[in-house]
């Protein structure tokens, strides 16, 4: 490819709407252009990266026995209603009607449609196990699309579905995909960590996310690296090793104290002279069927994912000021569990074990002191519903947990019979008994992986692509394209590289060398070969490594071998 022919419109200024580095650089380097909020056109450079990621994914899926197919983007509402997810999925599901007023959805995932396919085609244990996958556009109507390709409304994803006879078979398929994902992201040149996670709207039991570690990541990962321990979890899933026990402190009589204008934990602590750990925070939530009061210690935060799972609800949201007032009789900041009626109380173990705690009094400008769970109010459910923090003990080995930011690029799920039972996908076993097919699903965000690679591999000058997914491996730059000797040598280098299977761009533009160098750094070619007067005279090419800025001089007769060796290290 010649740079004069390459459609790669670069920008010198950072677009105002681009918040994160990957979004800025993908726009500036001419990889993508915005079509609408969360919707992008992928230009030729981006497509080369995407195709390389897809090829790595295909090779690893095929290695495990996966078979590629392609399912429709437009899915009939009936199968979503049959699975129970039509109403559960919420506003993120793109819904549409055809001219006959029939309901459809744009697929955010394909569990329903793949299960219906298998329901109609698989009937015997002899047809299992089965691994089917696709690479397909997905659609989610994000409330606030942001961060470019990180959180868009249209994106490219690989989703594989496993179908097994039993849980034992599912475990085998799950580990196959765990290993395959590890190889995919290793081959993409990414620094990542598999972490325990919550299954969310997909459902099922065990699940792992694959997180690319980057400061710009939206997710928080808690991990342990002590004593050879490899525990890691999304903060939404991170567990605690033990439950708090009550202290031997003697219970004192409950009493009310005026706390004018003290709504926050910090204000109450300062006014009453108590530490935050002596306060029980009461937060009011609404679900689709009831009102909940979530209790955590004053120095803790509610983990809404854990609370949702503990409650058994489908949806959960923090109650507004009007709801809090109608339920408690007080403004936000003064809610408490004592005397609370018509509300299910779910308490974290620390809050349940509190002695002589401070709570809201369900009366404005008033708090209660010496409140004791069990004596002064009844807890309906004790469950781990709080956020775990860095420094707290690892649930496996007890060492202090550390914190990192991550970008989720893949997730694997054990679905069990969640969809097969709902949609009637069954098979006959060796004894002729009908059994539900046991399923797993496994997703990789292709376009998100491209963005995550940039978040992890960039500097102030531009992108630093890992060689395995770079749009081109090498850019060849003649310093003066009007110099016949330099241009002829650049053409020779360019032709020899392609003949050796090395993807190269010849920058044949009449721009100044400095402009070409800046564009090369911005786009992120792993290697830059410069052809100047000295190169022509000495038959020696200058090769600059984008990753570390090192420059080496290579004789022309060693060109292909040296370039191949250098790319292997990148």
From Swiss-Prot:
GO cellular component: cytosol
Class of enzymatic activity (EC top level): ligase
Annotated catalysed reactions: tRNA(Pro) + L-proline + ATP = L-prolyl-tRNA(Pro) + AMP + diphosphate
Superkingdom: Bacteria
One Pfam family this sequence matches: tRNA-synt_2b
Transmembrane spans: none
Keywords assigned by UniProt, alphabetized: Aminoacyl-tRNA synthetase, ATP-binding, Cytoplasm, Ligase, Nucleotide-binding, Protein biosynthesis
EC number: 6.1.1.15
Record's keyword annotation contains Cell membrane: no
Protein location: Cytoplasm
GO biological process, any: prolyl-tRNA aminoacylation
Gene Ontology molecular-function annotations: aminoacyl-tRNA deacylase activity; ATP binding; catalytic activity, acting on a protein; proline-tRNA ligase activity; transferase activity
Major location (coarse): cytoplasm
Disulfide bonds: none
NCBIfam families: PRK09194.1, proS_fam_II
Domain notes: Consists of three domains: the N-terminal catalytic domain, the editing domain and the C-terminal anticodon-binding domain.
Job description of the protein: Catalyzes the attachment of proline to tRNA(Pro) in a two-step reaction: proline is first activated by ATP to form Pro-AMP and then transferred to the acceptor end of tRNA(Pro). As ProRS can inadvertently accommodate and process non-cognate amino acids such as alanine and cysteine, to avoid such errors it has two additional distinct editing activities against alanine. One activity is designated as 'pretransfer' editing and involves the tRNA(Pro)-independent hydrolysis of activated Ala-AMP.
Family: Belongs to the class-II aminoacyl-tRNA synthetase family. ProS type 1 subfamily.
Subunit structure: Homodimer.
This protein's name: Proline--tRNA ligase
Species per Swiss-Prot/TrEMBL record: Pelotomaculum thermopropionicum (strain DSM 13744 / JCM 10971 / SI)
Lineage, broadest ranks: Bacteria, Bacillati, Bacillota, Clostridia, Eubacteriales
């Amino acid at each position: 490819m010649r740079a004069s022919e390459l459609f790669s419109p670069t920008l010198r200024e950072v677009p105002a709407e681009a918040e994160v580095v990957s979004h800025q650089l993908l726009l500036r380097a001419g990889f993508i252009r915005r079509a609408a909020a969360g919707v992008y056109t992928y230009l030729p450079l981006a497509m080369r990266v995407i195709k390389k990621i897809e090829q790595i994914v295909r090779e690893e899926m095929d290695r495990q026995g996966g078979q590629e197919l392609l399912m429709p983007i437009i899915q009939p509402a009936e199968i979503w209603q049959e699975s129970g997810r039509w109403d559960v999925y919420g506003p993120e599901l793109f819904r549409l009607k055809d001219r006959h007023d029939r309901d459809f959805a744009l697929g955010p995932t394909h569990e329903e449609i793949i299960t219906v396919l298998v329901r109609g085609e698989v009937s015997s244990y002899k047809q299992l196990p089965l691994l089917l996958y696709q690479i397909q556009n997905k659609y989610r109507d994000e409330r606030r699309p942001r961060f470019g390709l990180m959180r868009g409304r249209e994106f490219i994803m690989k989703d594989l579905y496993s179908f097994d006879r039993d849980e034992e078979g599912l475990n085998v398929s799950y580990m196959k995909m765990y290993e395959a994902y590890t190889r995919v992201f290793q081959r993409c040149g990414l620094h990542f960590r598999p972490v325990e996670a919550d299954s969310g709207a997909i459902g099922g039991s065990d699940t792992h996310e694959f997180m690319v570690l980057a400061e710009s990541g939206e997710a928080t990962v808690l991990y342990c690296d002590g004593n050879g321990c490899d525990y890691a979890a999304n903060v939404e899933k991170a567990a605690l090793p033990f439950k708090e026990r009550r202290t031997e402190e003697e219970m004192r009589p409950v009493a009310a104290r005026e706390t004018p204008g003290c709504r926050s934990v910090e204000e109450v602590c300062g006014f009453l002279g108590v530490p935050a750990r002596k306060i029980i925070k009461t937060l009011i939530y609404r679900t689709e069927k009831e009102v909940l009061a979530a209790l955590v210690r004053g120095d803790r935060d509610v983990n809404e994912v854990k609370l949702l799972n503990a409650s058994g609800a489908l949806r959960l949201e923090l109650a507004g000021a009007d709801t809090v007032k109608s339920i408690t009789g007080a403004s936000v900041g003064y809610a408490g569990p004592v005397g609370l009626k018509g509300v299910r109380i779910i308490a974290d173990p620390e809050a349940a074990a509190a002695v002589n705690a401070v709570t809201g009094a369900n009366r404005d400008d008033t708090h209660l002191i010496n409140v004791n769970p069990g004596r002064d109010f009844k807890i309906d459910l004790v469950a781990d519903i709080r956020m775990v923090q860095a420094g707290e003990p690892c649930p496996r080995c007890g060492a202090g947990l550390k914190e990192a930011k991550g970008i989720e690029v893949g997730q694997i799920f054990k679905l069990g019979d969640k969809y097969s039972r709902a949609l009637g996908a069954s098979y006959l076993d060796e004894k002729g008994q009908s059994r539900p097919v046991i399923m797993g699903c496994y997703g990789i965000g292709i376009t998100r992986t491209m963005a995550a690679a940039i978040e992890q591999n960039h500097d102030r000058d531009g992108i630093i692509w890992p060689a395995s997914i770079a749009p081109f491996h090498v850019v060849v730059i003649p310093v003066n394209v009007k110099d016949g000797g330099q241009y002829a040598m650049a053409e020779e280098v360019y032709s020899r590289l392609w003949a050796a299977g090395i993807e190269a761009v010849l920058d044949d533009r009449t721009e100044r060398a400095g402009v070409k160098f800046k564009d090369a750094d911005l786009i992120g070619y792993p290697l830059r070969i410069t052809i100047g007067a000295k190169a022509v005279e000495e038959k020696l090419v200058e090769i600059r490594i984008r990753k570390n800025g090192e420059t080496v001089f290579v004789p022309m007769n060693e060109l292909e071998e040296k370039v191949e060796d250098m790319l292997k290290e990148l």
